[in-house]
């Protein structure tokens, strides 16, 4: 597939997602990194967004709850180039009813080259990177070329 680039702005659009057993862990991480997150645009799936906003006071655009379509909404935003990175504390030891949606979300993040942190260590590296406050060019699929080849 042909590639092109897209520029992530200095003020990133960050998705925050956590499975039920990991919501307290994500909340703790967000509280620890509140200052770093304040200068960015935050999105979250429904329940997670409401908890994080209530407990931290951060402005967070809440989508639907993950099992009710929020994972798919987030995937659509990624496909549209509206999400720059994702912090997703998922539960590796328990299956969730919407596992296919979770897999689709992670697949679409990979397709569109969106950085994803899936635990505290990777989230710490991501939020601490100097690129968090800079414009960053990333390589993405050239969808126009893809369409031109297929029609």
Curated annotation (Swiss-Prot):
Pfam (any one): MGS
Domain MGS-like: 6-151
InterPro entries: Methylgl_synth, Methylglyoxal_synth_AS, MGS-like_dom, MGS-like_dom_sf
Record-linked PROSITE patterns: METHYLGLYOXAL_SYNTH (PS01335), MGS (PS51855)
Lyase found in the keyword field: yes
EC number: 4.2.3.3
Record keywords, A-Z: Lyase
Active site: 71
Binding-site residues for substrate, renumbered to this chain: 19, 23, 45-48, 65-66, 98
Annotated Gene Ontology cellular component terms: cytosol
Lyase among keywords: yes
Entry's family note: Belongs to the methylglyoxal synthase family.
Role summary: Catalyzes the formation of methylglyoxal from dihydroxyacetone phosphate.
HAMAP family noted in UniProt: Methylglyoxal_synth (MF_00549)
The protein, known as: Methylglyoxal synthase
Organism: Aliivibrio fischeri (strain ATCC 700601 / ES114)
């Amino acid at each position: 597939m042909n590639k092109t680039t897209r520029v992530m702005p200095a003020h990133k659009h960050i998705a925050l997602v956590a499975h039920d057993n990991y919501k307290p862990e994500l909340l703790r991480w967000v509280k620890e990194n509140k200052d770093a997150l304040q200068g960015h645009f935050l999105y979250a799936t429904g329940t997670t967004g409401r908890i994080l906003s209530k407990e931290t006071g951060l402005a967070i655009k809440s989508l639907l709850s993950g099992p009710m379509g929020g994972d798919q909404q987030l995937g659509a935003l990624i496909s549209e180039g509206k999400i720059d990175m994702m912090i997703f504390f998922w539960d590796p030891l328990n299956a969730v009813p919407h596992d296919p949606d979770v897999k689709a979300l992670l697949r679409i993040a990979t397709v569109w080259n969106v950085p994803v942190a899936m635990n505290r260590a990777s989230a710490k590296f991501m939020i601490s990177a100097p690129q968090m406050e800079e414009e960053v060019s990333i390589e993405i699929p050239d969808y126009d070329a893809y369409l031109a080849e297929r029609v």
